[in-house]
UniProtKB/Swiss-Prot annotation:
This is Large ribosomal subunit protein uL29. Belongs to the universal ribosomal protein uL29 family. The lineage of its organism: Bacteria, Pseudomonadati, Verrucomicrobiota, Opitutia, Opitutales. Coiled coil: none annotated. The keyword Secreted does not apply. GO terms for biological process: translation. CDD domains: Ribosomal_L29_HIP.
């Protein structure tokens, strides 16, 4: 997910998107435990995307409070 895509998301959509990515991460972790994942780099990219979205969510909350 690119920074531009993150900025284009509405603040109300951020928690939903974070939840979706966390579910994907959970599924990927479970598949990794069973040895079904070939692209292990996806775990890292999902974690980073979640962090980026959480950062954007925090920034939007601070902006709304100010």
């Amino acid at each position: 997910m690119t920074p531009k895509e993150i900025r284009e998301l509405a603040p109300a959509e951020l928690p939903t998107k974070i939840r979706e990515l966390r579910e994907q991460l959970l599924q990927l972790k479970l598949r990794k435990q069973t040895g079904q994942v070939e692209k292990t780099h996806e775990l890292r990219s999902l974690r980073k995307d979640i962090a980026r979205l959480e950062t954007a969510l925090t920034a939007s909350k601070k902006k709304a409070a100010a």
